[in-house]
Amino acid sequence: RTAILANEIFNNYEKYSGVSIWVGAAAFTMQLYTDFDGCMDIVLGISECFGIRLPENFSAPFLSRSIEEYWRRWHISLGDWLKNYLFYPLLRTKFFMNLPKKLKGKLSKKGAKQATTFLAMLILWFTIGYWHGGAWTFIIGSGLLHWFYIVSGKLMEPLFVKWRAFFHIEKEKKGFILFQRVRTFFLVMIGLVFFRSATVPDALRVLGRGVSGLGLDWTELMILAVSILFSAWVTIHNQKEDMRVTLEKKSIWLRWIALYALLFYVILLGKYGPGYSASEFIYQNFKV
């Protein structure tokens, strides 16, 4: 039944927007999972009729708390095969063995090792995407996008640790575990929008429809994301040292550039920005 909903929305995405798009994406995600996992269950069942027990190929992937964990639970046989016969042998080739030495001086020892691993992972994830099909929708949706998720997650992990400490978030609390699972499902779902779409431009348009129907276009969404990240960074920085004190230690040119950049940011996106209305100031409705 999910196929009917997914096909209708993806084949006629111009007619839908906002929540409807995400419902269609979720429907296709579940369609793909139940179809693939159901097929494997049939294979396992037939094998057991002949006294052969095959290993499970899925292990509740949508309970995963990260993309890495998701791929340890999804299509397990493919992941194991590619790790053992592509990824690890690739890292043992002469080129990859010598790459950290070539990067010495340009990156730290840890950074050189990370860069080497990330490059090998890029080849691995490109191969995974290509295995699903030669089209760029598969290469991006099942491969490169997941590589980006994993690499960016590893690079930003120190920042995530600081955020959790600042907001007093315990990793094993049920609420945070639920957040991680929903986040992982959503990231997988974005990849499957590419997977399901006929072309990459179609996938981008589908995602655009999903955002526009929420009352935000891509520009506004990026501004919102940058503003939130910047505010979070300043908040965390202020726990160590007041931002004004930090700026006072910088050169006068850097101080003025920072101040004018923030001033124009506020003016262009506030008073003179699109959609601004003085009547929308929230606190005007509250009494002091």
Region locations from a protein language model:
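Membrane-embedded transmembrane alpha-helical bundles that form the catalytic cores
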Residues: 1-288
